[in-house]
């Protein structure tokens, strides 16, 4: 039924074509000189202009990717420094599928900013931030990106009490300009937050507030000035320290803006004794505490009453083995937010160990390694607060809520046909039992085809996927088959992409498609995401050696393929190491990381590293007055490429280290650890964490530690340290890996097509030799006619086979690409449907895509008048649902966008399709259906 429905829906809107007619063949070239008339494809994504209430509803429940891109040592950030799991698409999908639709990505930029080069931001660092943003955008989740620990209580460079505040503003502007330009073409799902918890050293609240407001104005002006979608983007700005009382009781004003009603207020909320104090004295959340919280959040009405939405960027509580109390607290927070135009983002710090003490500063909800919830009942409490109706004073809530599980429900439909770019609002109905307080969640099998959250289905790319609604408590589930077809548009779209790209592992480039329609936009697909990934913006990221094919598909169906070859990265079997000194110098207000001259290591052996203050200290350290190895958090040896942001982790799978000799200013120290230990952290980074460490202990006797500050005993103002060490058991990634069987390349292949007479076609590649081990990637040149399902296939007994789903009468060229250079082509003609399929036409109507308006980017900042007139033309949402807008018990609900909702019956008065059946032209009339809210 899935294939029949999608097929006939498409046929019902297709123009009549003679049987056997084939679409014109499109050449794929590397932008040869004969590409006349082709222009760079628009990278600016369609942007929906939503009201504050619509944004809050779509953003749903929020979650922080905490201790990840914000983790740092001496303001040198690293993704796995404060937690050990590298963020993946699966991590983000797990967050989404557990009910969250907003991810806040705190980012520390720190030493990734080159003060000596116009404040240039390290490209690999911002590229990694972009990758994680793309993982979220792929699910159509909202994403918040900020400047985080750079302004940490006067220890970073973003110091609001600086005597040279103009220089701070200059650097702040330069950094935000680069971030904004990098993301300027992203759609409405990306939000920028100006800063994190910024405050001065004293208690001069209004002085601090004035400085914060000054920076907020620089932020807004800078982002808006980069143009494209940044001219309309939602931005978020805090008051002093993101404190609710400071922000509401002192003179805090939002910055002036060139576009109206596009600013969030950012605040944080933690209850100090219950949520942050590292002891088990305060573990209970009470009704009195709830009343106090309601009163504190009521202060935010100063802004929400004016239509200004609020983001609670962080909230949460340490795990003190008090799950029921934390659940009560989280439900209260989200109930208050749900009734007050507020989005709440839970602080998840990503690291937990249930064997440790309960006060070990654990906020974790999601196990990022296993991709599963750690505390599902806490997530359930968050979502109950967000989606179940109740009084704003939370008087109906209490500790130990008993869940009445959903036992059954129905989807509003089983199948859906929708054009690329369209949005459809579905719902569940007939929920049993009626008194349930369970929640219905949503997920998609393939977000590249269609995404979903809270019943909102967005068509992203041609193909078929399954949308599943399921109850949170016991997993009662129902599914809908969604077929996405090409949107109606120009018939003569041309498309050109590079034939081949060659990359090194860990590098990236962009597809940079060219087209004769500047308003066309594209989706991208990689044949092998282990080798190459590709984002919604066409960013191609090389991950490991191999060959992959990237298909670029226009929203109207035209597609082209790029072969991507990923080769060895230079220096694959060597690593660069350096001594690092992490200062914790309150006397000079210097809290940063310094490093010495690196050495290159390629195997086991004995090596020596040095740090010389006169030669190795940076200009910033010298300017601050630092001139010796004093007042430190740690001295340690680390992978220098990781320190510089050139690598996320080390190229090693194993390595042990033993300290042989440590000399400070000519004095040899007494080493207490005489056995080898692992030099790798659990994150895979070569980082010894010692021999000097004021937190975890040092490997020498001549160190004194006070308040986590380390100094050398009896050595006055030491200038140099020399560390001699032995490495053993060193193993590089990929070393010694050999295939059990030698790969057998495809020498030649030919294709054949078999009509399965059910709206699908089998495409079969016959290869020589028959024992070839390469996989084959199949692509359709015009996916509006037919698209390949599961396009990558292995060779078995000399054949590889895939399935093509037909969408309309016409023709398309199918090309098969081997991992080597072998290719083959065949024309697939869709001429009609069988009599048995014709009855499927009554299943439903097509949900059409909205008109696309992608203007050319401009460096000119739009005036307020331009913003008002132009902001109504980007992608407008047209939605449809059979279900009543009234929420059912336990169901995630959201109000329809004002003036943007059309029922199928009202939107499609009549559809006439012309198909060929046994050589006879048959006209199928699809009559409009009445909505269930309409009297029949």
Show which residues each predicted segment covers.
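N-terminal carbohydrate-binding accessory modules
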Residues: 29-102
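Extracytoplasmic soluble-region selector
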Residues: 403-570, 738-857, 895-906
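An active-site-proximal structural segment forming one wall of the substrate-binding cleft
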Residues: 85-100, 120-147, 156-191, 215-224
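Extracellular beta-strand ligand-recognition surfaces/modules
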Residues: 615-653, 696-711, 718-722
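Extracellular Ser/Thr-rich, low-complexity/disordered mucin-like segments
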Residues: 882-911
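Aromatic-rich peripheral "rim/lid" segments of glycoside hydrolase catalytic domains that contact
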Residues: 322-405
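Active-site region of glycoside hydrolase catalytic domains
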Residues: 170-281, 295-318, 339-342
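C-terminal membrane-anchoring or membrane-association module
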Residues: 916-936
